[in-house]
Each structure stands twice: as structure tokens, then as C-alpha cells.
């Protein structure tokens, strides 16, 4: 026999129907706030239940368990824990901009500590919470049956201030979520008033009075474009940043002090995260982290190592930790029973409509009540005017029913009026009492006329709303806590996280590049043996060495006449003896393409200037720097080369500089670059020097008469010669002798102009570096041998050199601890 209690259904259809019912229940009745009062059902039921229980600000606190039990039993049958958690949140200053519950006991902390059990804590409504329920007994809102029909509960609260804006809302429903930030009470009220006074105002105009969120924990909002987008569309994102200060201790060390955290950030988790980053060496320079917060406020201290930069560490903290977070707007709320993403204007419009309805319903309630009372008083006045006859009717009637009927018939009274006459005490028959009744009646008639006028004039309703909100603003508003920073959010670029310091960039002949701290090499006297400066093998040597800063942009010009770009910090740091990283791992070089020149291109130093190119075959070209602003990842053509030619040198010039070019066989030519017009990137250039047989260009430099020309030969000889010994001539000549080339000193390794104060770093093909001051190199004439500046091992040759800033110390000091630690980290 078939069981009549079993019903055959289609599983697919049942799943769809049941899930939709469940989803709508969660969306409408659990997770999302109503746009009118800004409350989810659980919060509304808690506040209404507390009000009905009499747990108001003027009464003592009541046990939380009693409140949650009452709310659960009457209105919210979903478990006491969810009710208690919602009530606890309404009592936390770091969660609500204006707390709706006044908690007594342990209600948690912004460190993530939970509240004590509900049997231990007590609560009552806060004063401002009463404003949400004010006039609820005047038929201002609709009521509905509770879950079992035994009680009545409000569908929405009167909400005499815009709670959805003031306290915001968060919630996750089925397939949707809401995230509305809190705002300043005064600003929210001013925004509502602006819309009432200027219905055609724009979002930009609204932002003049409500510029952005005001979080209970304060902090900084970085930029305003995200706010405008969110206010305009209901969706957007802003960056929240902790309020920090960098203090200097009496010992000269720096510390970072955090006094305000972004909204919703757990302070303890931030503490743990910073410690973990320091332990994992992902964030260096931090020596201690302490939470010194107290009743006086938040104070979170991060101690910095003496040699570290607090600014760089702080930027790293912003990038790696919750000291900087994003807040995503998703202003989803229930509007007319339907979930909808709302703009700021729509939220305010809905609130104004709700307040108009509340005022109209309250006014009607007061008017009906006044009319009912006036009706009674009118009957009493009739009775007092005919007192003897009324007394006679009552005395001669056998029952009160007969008396009431007679009074109604004789004086044309209603049932309520006649009953009021019968209920009237004898004391009210005095003349004084009649005057009181008449006065009350007259006052009621005036009140009824005023209430009728309110209902007839919408502008009076608007005025009442504004006046009552102004009173709330006067009583409860407080200053803004969150500071809105002017300008857009600056995304943290990599260089914001890198401490700016002087470094050396070396590039070996086989293409290994690395970055070293410049202070690893200190000046030696002329003739010193030098220290091992690179980790090249016997068959490799350093070709390029440049002194720069970690934040500078480096342009890499290749033998193919192409140019690439890198930030100095993008080049990995290695120890002195480490080999480095193959340059092909950083730049997309073609087969056979090698770096010939690295030039430092600081923006402030390149504006309006040109690049001066010199090739191995003596061809020169001048091109404006601005043509190299946008260098692709795969490089850019810098100049067109003739077959067999290579680019060997690039200079940054003003357009009016004198240029000197030196050749391998010891000749040089000086000319003014103005004789060469600016050319495009694809141009080949013109002849700069006419080379002798088997000769080639080894260097080019800008030159002024107050400078000196420094030349160094392959066998370690060098000399300085006054620039005045090099006359300016036209380009394209064979040049004049600049050094006496012999087997002893070898051919020219390079040429550069100096002022005599610089340090020079000389590199051999064995990877040995010596640093010495230019002043230690003798001054001699043009066609001389020079002096020995570096003792070379057998088969060693000088391949290149570069100028660096001078140092006071003359003793070579190598920080081996730092070298070893860096080498081990990189090699591993």
C-alpha cells in the first residue's frame, strides 16, 4: 500500500525552489540591513526587545543572558549566541561609530579578544539608541506578527537619525554581501539636510558636507576618487592607512609609533605578522615590537635598528602588513523588500522618504489623539453648561444605561461623551474646573489646527525633520576621527620600499652584473696593491663600473646601438667576491649583444639635455634625451650602426659642451658638440675623429678649460694634464698625442676629464679593484709617460675605470661580515 504521507517530487525543481526560499530568507530576514533604519532584523529585535524590557539608559544594567533570552523567546528564534554576538558588537567602540548598547563588563577588545559569557556581562540601551525607537508607540511604523504569532514586532524602526550611514553595515548573504562604512553623525545629518534643501545636488556637492567615511578607529583615508566612485555607484574601494609617527629616542635611534589602526584590523595579528616577517628576514631593521596601549589610547611601538631607515621600513610595513588595508564599498541594502546596491544619494532619499512617513504618521496619531480628547472635552463643556438638567436626568434614571441614553438624546452627544459625563467626578463641577476644561479645549483646537496644517504642507514636514535632526546633532555629534588625505593614494612603488643608498654597479666581460654597497671600498694611497673587488673567474673581468644610487634609473647602451633601462635596486646585491647575475636574466639581449656603457639618468639632471654617442670607428651623434622616455622591455634603437662598427660610449651633454675623444694608440681630438645637429634615434651620425690604421676609440668625455684630462694605460700608468693643453678644433681630425705610448706603459685604456677632487676606481682583467684619489696621480704634459698608479700581477691589464665621490679615509676597510652574509644569502 502506498504511504499517503510520501509525495513524489522532481529533485531538480525542489532544489531550485527550496534554495531560492532559503536564499531569500537569509537575504531579507537575516543578513542585510534595511535602508530606512540601517538595521538587520537581529539588531532591530535586540533594540526593540531591550526597549520593551525597560533596559533604557535611565535604568540599571540588566544581565545579557536575560536580554538575549527574552529576544530569542519572543522575536529571534535562531540561537542565543548569534543574538549575543550582535549585541556585543553594538557595544564595542571600535566596531560602531556610535554604540547602540551600553555594555558593562568584558565586551572584548580590538586585539580580537572575545567578550565574556553572557551570564557575566550586563547591558542596557545607549542614549542615542533611544533616537532609533523614539515615537515607535505613535503608530509611526508598521508591526508584524513574530515567528509564532504570539507577539508583535516592528517591521522597521522610526530611526530619527540616518543609522545606515552613521554606523554602516557588514553582512554576507547567499550570493551577495554588503559592506557599508560608518560616517560622522554631524556630516550625515548635514548631507540629509542638503538633499532636502537642494534636491538637485550632485554627488560632488554632497561630498562637500560628507567628504568620506569616519571610522571609529580613526586612521587615514588615502585619496578621494574611490570615495566619489562609491558614493556615485554604490561600489568602490579606498585605502586605509594607520596613523603613525616616527620618533627619535635620546640615543638617536628611530622608532615607529602607531596610534590608530585601520577599521577592522586586529592589533595582535599585526604584532604577530611583523614579528614573523622580521624572523623570516623578509623585513630587516626591526629590533623590537611592543604594544603599549592603555586606557589613554592605542600606542603600538616598532623599534628600529640604528643604521636602518624608519621611512623605508614603514613603507614596507604598509605594503606587507595590515597597517594599510583596502576597504571595499558594496552598499547593498533592502529597499522595498528587495536587495539593491544603492548610491549615497539613494540611501539619503530612502531615509528622507522614511522620515516623511514617520512624521506624517506621528502627526496623524497626535491629531487623532487630540481630536478624541477635544471631543470628550466638548461633551463635558456641554454638560457643565446644562448642569442642573444633566443632574436631573442622571437622578431620575434607574440605570446608568438609561442615563447615558437620555443624555445622548437630549444634548446630541456621542456614546463616549455621554460616558465621560457619567464618569466625571463631582469636584469637576466647580467653576474653576470648568475654566480648566475650557482652556484645555482651546489648546487642543489650536493643536489640531497646527497638526492639520503640518499634514497639508510638505514643507513643514521637511522643517520638522531638519529641526529634530539638528537637536540630535547637538546632543550626540562629535569630531571626525578619520582624516581624509588630500590627493590620490600613492601606490607603494618598489623604490618606496628600498632604502636609498650609494652603490656600485659592476658588469663583467661575460655579462655578470651585481650591486655592491659603495662603502665596501675605501681609498688607498697611490701604488697600493688593492683588494679583490669582484668574483670573476680567471677568464673573465669587469668591463663596466658605475657609481649610482639605488633609486636611480640606469640606461644600458649596447654594442648593437640599442638601449635598455633598469632601476639600480632591480639589480641584485651580492658580496664583493660573488660573481653576480647574468645580465640576460634582467635584460632581453639579442645573441652577441653586450652592454658597452651604463649611464645614470636621473630625471632632474636630464631635462633638456642630449645623449652624445661615440662609436668604435669614430662616428658621433647627438640625440635629445626626451626621445628615450619610453623604453620598451625589449629595448629601443639608440642609433644606426655601420657594418662592423660598435657603440662604445654615451655622454649626457647640454648641447654646447666641448667633447674630447681618446684613441687606443694615444691620440685625442677636442671639438664643440654644437657643430653636430641633433639627430633622431634611427640616424647613423657623423665622423668625430679620423682614426689611424689599427686604431680605435677608447673613451670620450665632456671637457672644460678648468678641468684636467686623466688618461690611464693598460700597464697601470696614469697622468693628469691640463685641459688647456688640448686645443678645440673641428671634428673629424686625426687628433694630437695625449700620451707617450711605449711597451712599458702600454696602450691607452681610457680617457676622462676630472677636476682633481674625485676618487677613481681602476679595474683589471683579473677582477682586482683599486680606489685612489685623483689628486694622488701626478700632473704632467700631454705627450708623457705618466706614473705608476697600480701594481699589476703578471698578465694583468687595466680594462676600465670610473670616477666616484671622494672619501676621507685612506685605509682600505672591508666589512667581511656583511660580505659573507650577503654572499651566502645570494649563493644559496
From Swiss-Prot:
Enumerate the Gene Ontology biological process terms: DNA topological change; DNA-templated DNA replication
Assign the protein's first listed, main location to one coarse class: cytoplasm
Q: What class of enzyme is it?
A: isomerase
Name the residue ranges of motif: GyrA-box. Answer: 524-530
What are the catalytic residues? 120 (o-(5'-phospho-dna)-tyrosine intermediate)
Question: Among the entry's GO cellular component annotations, what is one?
Answer: cytoplasm
Q: What is its EC number?
A: 5.6.2.2
Give the subcellular location.
Cytoplasm
Reply yes or no: does the keyword Heme apply: no
Annotated GO MF terms: ATP binding; DNA binding; DNA negative supercoiling activity
Q: Which PROSITE patterns match?
A: TOPO_IIA
Q: Which residues form the Topo IIA-type catalytic domain?
A: 32-497
- Keywords associated with the record: ATP-binding, Cytoplasm, DNA-binding, Isomerase, Nucleotide-binding, Topoisomerase
Q: Does the keyword DNA-binding apply?
A: yes
What catalytic reaction does the record list?
ATP-dependent breakage, passage and rejoining of double-stranded DNA
Q: Pfam family example for this protein? A: DNA_topoisoIV
The record's section on SUPFAM superfamilies has:
GyrA/ParC C-terminal domain-like, Type II DNA topoisomerase
Its quaternary organisation is: Heterotetramer, composed of two GyrA and two GyrB chains. In the heterotetramer, GyrA contains the active site tyrosine that forms a transient covalent intermediate with DNA, while GyrB binds cofactors and catalyzes ATP hydrolysis.
Q: Which NCBIfam families match?
A: gyrA, PRK05560.1, PRK05561.1
Family assignment from sequence similarity: Belongs to the type II topoisomerase GyrA/ParC subunit family.
Its job:
A type II topoisomerase that negatively supercoils closed circular double-stranded (ds) DNA in an ATP-dependent manner to modulate DNA topology and maintain chromosomes in an underwound state. Negative supercoiling favors strand separation, and DNA replication, transcription, recombination and repair, all of which involve strand separation. Also able to catalyze the interconversion of other topological isomers of dsDNA rings, including catenanes and knotted rings. Type II topoisomerases break and join 2 DNA strands simultaneously in an ATP-dependent manner.
Q: What else is known?
A: Few gyrases are as efficient as E.coli at forming negative supercoils. Not all organisms have 2 type II topoisomerases; in organisms with a single type II topoisomerase this enzyme also has to decatenate newly replicated chromosomes.
Q: What is this protein called?
A: DNA gyrase subunit A
Source species: Streptococcus pyogenes serotype M1
Amino acid at each position: 500500500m502506498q504511504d499517503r504521507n510520501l509525495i513524489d517530487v522532481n529533485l531538480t525543481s525542489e532544489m531550485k525552489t527550496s534554495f531560492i526560499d532559503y536564499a531569500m530568507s537569509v537575504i531579507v530576514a537575516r543578513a542585510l540591513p534595511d535602508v530606512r533604519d540601517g538595521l538587520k532584523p537581529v539588531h532591530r529585535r535586540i533594540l526593540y526587545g531591550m526597549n520593551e524590557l525597560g533596559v533604557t539608559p535611565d535604568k540599571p544594567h540588566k544581565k545579557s543572558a536575560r536580554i538575549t533570552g527574552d529576544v530569542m523567546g519572543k522575536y529571534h528564534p535562531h540561537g542565543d549566541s548569534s543574538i549575543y554576538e550582535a549585541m556585543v558588537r553594538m557595544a564595542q567602540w571600535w566596531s560602531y561609530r556610535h554604540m547602540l548598547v551600553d555594555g558593562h563588563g568584558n565586551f572584548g577588545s580590538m586585539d580580537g579578544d572575545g567578550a565574556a559569557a553572557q551570564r557575566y556581562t550586563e547591558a542596557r540601551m545607549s542614549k542615542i539608541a533611544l533616537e532609533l525607537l523614539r515615537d515607535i508607540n505613535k503608530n509611526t511604523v508598521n508591526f508584524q506578527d513574530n515567528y509564532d504569532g504570539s507577539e508583535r514586532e516592528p517591521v522597521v524602526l522610526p530611526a530619527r537619525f540616518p543609522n545606515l550611514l552613521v554606523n554602516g553595515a557588514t553582512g554576507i548573504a547567499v550570493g551577495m554581501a554588503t559592506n557599508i562604512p560608518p560616517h560622522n553623525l554631524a556630516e550625515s545629518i548635514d548631507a540629509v539636510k542638503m538633499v532636502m534643501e537642494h534636491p538637485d545636488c550632485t554627488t560632488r556637492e554632497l561630498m562637500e558636507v560628507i567628504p568620506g567615511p569616519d571610522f571609529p578607529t580613526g586612521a587615514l583615508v588615502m585619496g578621494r576618487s574611490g570615495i566619489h566612485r562609491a558614493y556615485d555607484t554604490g561600489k568602490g574601494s579606498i585605502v586605509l592607512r594607520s596613523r603613525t609617527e616616527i620618533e627619535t629616542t635620546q640615543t638617536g635611534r628611530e622608532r615607529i609609533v602607531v596610534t590608530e589602526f585601520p577599521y577592522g584590523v586586529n592589533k595582535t595579528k599585526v604584532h604577530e605578522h611583523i614579528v614573523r616577517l622580521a624572523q623570516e628576514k623578509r623585513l630587516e631593521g626591526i629590533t623590537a615590537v611592543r604594544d603599549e596601549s592603555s586606557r589613554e589610547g592605542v600606542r603600538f611601538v616598532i623599534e628600529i635598528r640604528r643604521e636602518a631607515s624608519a621611512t623605508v621600513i614603514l613603507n614596507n610595513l604598509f605594503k606587507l602588513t595590515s597597517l594599510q588595508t583596502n576597504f571595499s564599498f558594496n552598499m547593498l541594502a533592502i529597499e522595498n523588500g528587495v536587495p539593491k546596491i544603492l548610491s549615497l544619494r539613494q540611501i539619503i532619499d530612502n531615509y528622507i522618504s522614511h522620515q516623511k512617513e514617520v512624521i506624517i504618521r506621528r502627526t496623524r496619531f497626535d491629531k487623532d489623539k487630540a481630536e478624541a480628547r477635544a471631543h470628550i472635552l466638548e461633551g463635558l463643556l456641554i454638560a457643565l453648561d446644562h448642569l442642573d438638567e444633566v443632574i436631573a436626568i442622571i437622578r431620575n434614571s434607574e440605570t446608568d444605561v438609561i442615563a447615558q441614553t437620555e443624555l445622548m438624546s437630549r444634548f446630541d452627544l456621542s456614546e463616549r461623551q455621554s460616558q465621560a459625563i457619567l464618569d466625571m467626578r463631582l469636584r469637576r463641577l466647580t467653576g474653576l474646573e470648568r475654566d480648566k476644561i475650557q482652556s484645555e479645549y482651546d489648546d487642543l483646537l489650536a493643536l489640531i489646527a497646527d497638526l492639520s496644517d503640518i499634514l497639508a504642507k510638505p514643507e513643514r514636514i521637511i522643517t520638522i525633520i531638519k529641526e529634530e535632526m539638528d537637536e540630535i546633532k547637538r546632543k550626540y555629534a562629535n569630531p571626525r576621527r578619520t582624516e581624509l588625505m588630500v590627493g590620490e593614494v600613492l601606490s607603494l612603488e618598489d623604490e618606496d620600499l628600498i632604502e636609498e643608498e650609494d652603490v656600485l654597479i659592476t658588469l663583467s666581460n661575460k655579462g655578470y652584473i651585481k650591486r655592491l654597497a659603495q662603502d665596501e671600498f675605501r681609498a688607498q694611497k697611490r701604488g697600493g696593491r688593492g683588494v679583490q673587488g669582484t668574483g670573476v673567474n680567471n677568464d673573465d673581468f669587469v668591463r663596466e663600473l658605475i657609481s649610482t644610487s639605488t633609486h636611480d634609473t640606469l640606461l644600458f647602451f649596447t654594442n648593437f646601438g640599442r638601449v635598455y633601462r633598469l632601476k639600480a635596486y632591480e639589480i641584485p646585491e651580492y658580496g664583493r667576491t660573488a660573481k653576480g647575475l647574468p645580465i640576460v636574466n634582467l635584460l632581453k639581449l639579442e645573441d652577441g649583444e653586450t652592454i658597452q656603457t651604463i649611464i645614470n639618468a636621473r630625471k632632474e639632471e636630464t631635462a633638456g639635455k642630449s645623449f652624445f654617442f661615440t662609436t668604435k670607428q669614430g662616428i658621433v651623434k647627438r640625440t635629445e634625451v626626451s626621445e628615450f622616455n619610453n623604453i620598451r622591455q625589449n629595448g629601443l634603437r639608440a642609433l644606426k650602426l655601420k657594418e662592423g662598427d660598435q657603440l662604445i660610449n654615451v655622454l649626457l651633454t647640454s648641447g654646447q659642451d666641448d667633447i674630447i675623444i681618446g684613441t687606443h694608440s694615444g691620440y685625442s681630438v677636442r671639438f664643440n658638440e654644437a657643430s653636430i645637429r641633433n639627430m633622431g634615434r634611427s640616424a647613423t651620425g657623423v665622423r668625430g675623429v679620423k682614426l689611424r690604421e689599427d686604431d680605435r676609440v677608447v673613451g670620450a668625455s665632456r671637457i672644460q678649460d678648468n678641468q684636467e684630462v686623466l688618461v690611464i694605460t693598460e700597464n697601470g700608468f696614469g697622468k693628469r694634464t691640463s685641459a688647456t693643453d688640448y686645443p678645440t678644433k673641428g671634428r673629424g681630425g686625426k687628433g694630437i698625442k695625449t700620451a707617450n705610448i711605449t711597451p712599458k706603459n702600454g696602450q691607452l685604456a681610457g680617457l676622462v676629464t676630472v677636476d682633481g677632487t674625485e676618487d677613481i676606481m681602476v679595474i683589471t682583467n683579473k677582477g682586482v679593484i683599486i680606489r685612489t684619489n685623483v689628486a694622488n696621480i701626478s700632473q704632467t704634459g700631454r705627450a708623457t709617460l705618466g706614473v705608476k698608479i697600480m701594481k699589476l700581477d703578471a698578465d694583468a691589464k687595466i680594462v676600465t675605470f670610473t670616477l666616484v665621490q671622494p672619501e676621507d679615509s685612506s685605509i682600505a676597510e672591508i666589512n667581511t661580515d656583511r660580505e659573507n652574509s650577503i654572499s651566502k644569502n645570494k649563493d644559496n
